[in-house]
């Protein structure tokens, strides 16, 4: 009895069990388990219950509360239930033995493995980095319990206000803040290291991108050469097939009768004789070889400019020796037509930046032009409009000068002489000339089989390109007089200002189906109906001559010498948006994303329609004012983000936009 009584009075409850049927023997008795359970229950109640002094045992309450939350998870409960089915003997046997523990404690890694550890330039250990990250995690957890923390801070504030803080508490708080400052320094250095790594990766990616762009440019050059060779081979095959077909056709039978019989036949039947003589004469005259029209097929579209940054220069070409008056191209890296005051019209291959020929025929400088599907229309100061078909090109090398004045400078002659060996004159491209205006042609536009031309004779003419004749003449002055007489709300009312004498009377035109938009020197934009020949609507807003315009399905954009660009809503006839520059607008064009304009500066003015951002593009960007300045931009053209500009010194450059 004394022996059992001493076991009950043992403070540990299990430490005094020495029977062979104890924990290491056959098992634990129910009495020992009940005693252990009572002690655990009392200990847990003491730890988790409310304490009279909040300064002692607070971390125990927090720890047990966390354990209680973890025990509520279903996975944890299943593990506990499975643990109760295991006997204490199995639990003890599942532990590591003393030998295994000693072996793991004294084991060490060989020097070969330690030598392969990479060197690290960081002065902070992995554990310090973990501590810094752990502090961030604890900070986020504290924010989740913001309400409870705020209440605790209020209680601490009340306590501190009531009782002065002890020096030991202040020292602990100082040490805590110093530790946090040290961890903040570690985290800052870690962030700086990550930023440097990211910068290095970005630089490497930029270098890789440049290498791939160069490779893409080379592939497109090879592709263009292969396409050119393929077109030449196909043309040769077509020529050989035509020659074979001509050789298979039998020659016409020659008459065997004598000349006397022929004379008698002619005298007997005059009509028959005339026909016979006509045939015989024309058979003896060598007829020119007919040129078969060949369409220039584009098998692939260039994509290099799509990967350049906006504002990057693609090519710069010394195109002319005088100011560029008109430029246009069909598609990016395709065919470009340029005209200037040096009385030349040049055809360019934008893929290689080379002049491939000239369009000769005008007696004066070309003021306006357009290219569409190998068809080129040019309007000149000689009051004529000429049509050209580039698919009928037959190139022969010759001098590139069209008309040269005697007072030309020697530098211009040297430039032409240097380009003569590399340029060719396009023959057989001329189709016909449209001659009806009595003054210079200042604007033109064609769509389908309809061409509209505007002239300084103050008229607009509609041409049928199939028949090659004028089908309608629109008198702009008569339309303006009629509008001022009617005085309706949507028509023009005289403002008392006179048109600028230096400006073109018809500054810009564009047609689509039966709709025609025309901008004139009086600042008016008139919308015509070609079916009736009447002005459908007049847009009032500009205070200077209209120099350029373009419209799509919804909006019409106009540029004027009053330094403003206005965007009109075609559905209502009102102004949708407007902005201005420092100098007059000489040229303008837009695509789906941007509006580009030449505004009397050495840069192209770009306006993003999506976000309303204005920026400059061209050779004048970033140029020091004290150094040499690029020439003023006179003409701009934009298609699919591919920008071409023509300058006052005759240089033409291509940019990404």
From Swiss-Prot:
Mitochondrion in keyword set: yes
Residues that span the membrane, as ranges: none
Annotated membrane topology: Peripheral membrane protein
Basic and acidic residues: compositionally biased ranges: 1-10
Protease among keywords: no
Subcellular location: Mitochondrion outer membrane
The entry's keywords: Coiled coil, Membrane, Mitochondrion, Mitochondrion outer membrane, Repeat, WD repeat
Coiled-coil regions listed in the entry: 210-250
Basic residues: bias regions: 141-152
Family stated for the protein in its record: Belongs to the WD repeat MDV1/CAF4 family.
Function: Involved in mitochondrial fission. Acts as an adapter protein required to form mitochondrial fission complexes. Formation of these complexes is required to promote constriction and fission of the mitochondrial compartment at a late step in mitochondrial division.
Protein name: Mitochondrial division protein 1
Organism for this UniProt entry: Aspergillus niger (strain ATCC MYA-4892 / CBS 513.88 / FGSC A1513)
């Amino acid at each position: 009895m004394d022996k059992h009584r001493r076991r009950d009075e043992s403070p540990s409850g299990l430490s005094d069990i020495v029977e062979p049927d104890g924990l290491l023997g056959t098992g634990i008795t129910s009495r020992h388990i009940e005693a252990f359970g009572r002690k655990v229950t009392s200990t847990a109640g003491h730890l988790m219950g409310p304490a009279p002094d909040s300064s002692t045992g607070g971390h125990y309450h927090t720890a047990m509360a966390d354990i209680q939350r973890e025990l509520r998870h279903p996975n944890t409960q299943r593990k506990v239930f499975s643990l109760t089915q295991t006997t204490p003997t199995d639990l003890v046997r599942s532990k590591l033995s003393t030998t295994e523990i000693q072996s793991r404690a004294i084991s060490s890694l060989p020097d070969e493995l330690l030598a392969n550890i990479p060197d690290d330039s960081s002065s902070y250990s992995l554990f310090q980095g973990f501590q810094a990250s752990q502090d961030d995690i604890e900070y986020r957890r504290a924010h989740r319990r913001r309400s409870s923390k705020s209440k605790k801070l209020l209680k601490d504030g009340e306590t501190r206000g009531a009782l002065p803080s002890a020096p030991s508490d202040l020292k602990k708080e100082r040490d805590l803040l110093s530790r946090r400052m040290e961890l903040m320094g570690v985290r800052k250095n870690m962030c700086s290291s990550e930023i440097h790594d990211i910068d290095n990766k970005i630089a490497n990616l930029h270098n890789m991108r440049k290498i791939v762009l160069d490779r893409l440019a080379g592939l497109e050059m090879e592709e263009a050469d292969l396409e050119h060779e393929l077109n030449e081979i196909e043309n040769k095959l077509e020529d050989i097939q035509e020659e074979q077909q001509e050789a298979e056709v039998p020659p016409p039978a020659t008459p065997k009768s004598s000349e006397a019989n022929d004379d008698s036949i002619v005298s007997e039947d005059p009509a028959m004789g005339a026909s016979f003589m006509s045939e015989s004469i024309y058979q003896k005259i060598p007829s020119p070889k007919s040129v078969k029209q060949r369409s220039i097929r584009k098998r692939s579209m260039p994509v290099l400019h799509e990967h350049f940054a906006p504002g990057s220069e693609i090519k710069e070409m010394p195109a002319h020796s005088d100011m560029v008056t008109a430029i246009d191209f069909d598609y990016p890296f395709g065919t470009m037509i340029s005209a200037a005051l040096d009385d030349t019209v040049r055809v360019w291959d934008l893929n290689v930046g080379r002049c491939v020929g000239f369009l000769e025929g005008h007696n004066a400088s070309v003021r306006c032009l357009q290219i569409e599907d190998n068809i080129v229309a040019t309007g000149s100061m000689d009051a004529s409009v000429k049509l050209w078909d580039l698919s009928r090109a037959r190139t022969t090398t010759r001098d590139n000068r069209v008309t040269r004045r005697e007072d030309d400078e020697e530098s211009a002659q040297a430039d032409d002489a240097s380009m003569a060996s590399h340029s060719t004159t396009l023959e057989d491209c001329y189709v016909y000339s449209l001659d009806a205006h009595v003054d210079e042609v200042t604007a033109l536009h064609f769509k389908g089989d309809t061409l509209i031309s505007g002239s300084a004779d103050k008229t607009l003419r509609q041409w049928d390109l199939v028949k090659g004749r004028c089908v309608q003449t629109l008198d702009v002055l008569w339309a303006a007089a009629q509008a001022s007489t009617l005085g309706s709300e949507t028509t023009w009312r005289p403002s008392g200002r006179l048109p600028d004498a230096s400006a073109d009377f018809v500054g810009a035109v564009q047609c689509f189906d039966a709709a025609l938009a025309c901008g004139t020197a009086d600042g008016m934009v008139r919308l015509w109906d070609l079916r009736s020949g009447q002005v459908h609507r007049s847009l009032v807003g500009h205070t200077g001559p209209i120099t350029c315009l373009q419209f799509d399905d919804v909006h019409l954009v106009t540029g004027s010498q009053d330094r403003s660009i206005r965007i009109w809503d075609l559905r209502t006839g009102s102004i949708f948006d407007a902005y201005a520059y420092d100098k007059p607008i000489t040229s303008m064009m837009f695509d789906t994303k941007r509006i580009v304009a030449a505004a009397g500066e050495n840069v192209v003015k770009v306006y993003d329609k999506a976000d309303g951002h204005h920026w400059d593009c061209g050779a004048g960007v970033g140029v020091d004012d004290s150094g040499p300045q690029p020439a003023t931009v006179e003409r701009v053209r934009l298609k699919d983000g591919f920008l071409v500009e023509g300058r006052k010194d005759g240089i033409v450059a291509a940019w990404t936009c």
